[in-house]
Amino acid sequence: MAISKKSSLFLPIFTFITMFLMVVNKVSSSTHETNALHFMFNQFSKDQKDLILQGDATTGTDGNLELTRVSSNGSPQGSSVGRALFYAPVHIWESSAVVASFEATFTFLIKSPDSHPADGIAFFISNIDSSIPSGSTGRLLGLFPDANVIRNSTTIDFNAAYNADTIVAVELDTYPNTDIGDPSYPHIGIDIKSVRSKKTAKWNMQNGKVGTAHIIYNSVDKRLSAVVSYPNADSATVSYDVDLDNVLPEWVRVGLSASTGLYKETNTILSWSFTSKLKSNEIPDIATVV
């Protein structure tokens, strides 16, 4: 059968369009398989619109994030609490029981004129409308409400006191508050809905030196792990198995929190990055900040 000149021109065009649509369809399918969020702050500007600052937290001082209050000459102040949360929610799990894996890293500088720095920094995950609990300065790290527990009580119900329904945190605790279950030394710990850590490890905090905290959640093993280190020094490592869909709501925000009390320290964040990945049939919500 003879093919007209017009038909011979149409066939290559039709073939090209068909192949193009196949490629587009393939790309779209693979994109929908992953719901991801990524951000990275190598420095912090004075008007950092993609952070939700709470309490005494400020940005822009030498390109850093100051979580707790400092004076005009940079000296730390007592009884301060501050938090910074990333503006975009994180899809941490979905109804099909798929849970996201995530990784967070931040560099920090804790400096204190006191012989006992206090009280520490925490990376935390909470509900999207999370705010600083009342009375959460000092040992409560800006994460847990003050339950007014009688200090001379010989028994403390930790299931009812100093807890929060939707908090998962990794704490860098510079001051041991043994009356609420802390070990008798500075430590890192994993907190699940309570200031009393599920697991702790001794931490040799170095006053005035830059350290790095690296946090990983493996959704396959359901293991939350953290490593805190300084250059040319031994690292502190802690891990705990937790199923996040039993602890957290489906959508959460991630943040950094810090507090001071009677004793004080600077709680300075120099950089912060976060990546999460959830296998899903939904279109991904990806935010990137450099």
UniProtKB/Swiss-Prot annotation:
GO MF annotation, one: D-mannose binding
Positions contributing to Mn(2+) binding: E171, D173, D182, H187
Residues the UniProt record annotates as site (Cleavage): N148, V149, N163, A164, N281, E282
Keywords: Antiviral protein, Calcium, Glycoprotein, Lectin, Manganese, Mannose-binding, Metal-binding, Plant defense, Signal
Signal peptide residue numbers: 1-29
PTM summary: The mature chain consists of residues 164-281 followed by 30-148. To form a mature chain the precursor undergoes further post-translational modification after removal of the signal sequence; cleavage after Asn at positions 148, 163, and 281 is followed by transposition and ligation (By formation of a new peptide bond) of residues 164-281 and 30-148. This maturation (circular permutation) relies on the legumain AEP1 activity and leads to an increased stability of conA after heat stress and at various pH.
Residues noted as binding a carbohydrate in the record, renumbered to the chain: D119, R139, L262, Y263
Amino-acid positions noted as binding Ca(2+) in the UniProt annotation, renumbered to this chain: D119, D173, Y175, N177, D182
Keyword Nucleotide-binding tagged: no
Family assignment from sequence similarity: Belongs to the leguminous lectin family.
Role according to the record: D-mannose specific lectin. Displays antiviral activity and therefore may contribute to defense against infections.
Other comment: Binds one manganese (or another transition metal) ion and one calcium ion. The metal ions are essential for the saccharide-binding and cell-agglutinating activities.
Protein's UniProt name: Concanavalin-A
Source organism of the structure: Canavalia ensiformis (Jack bean)
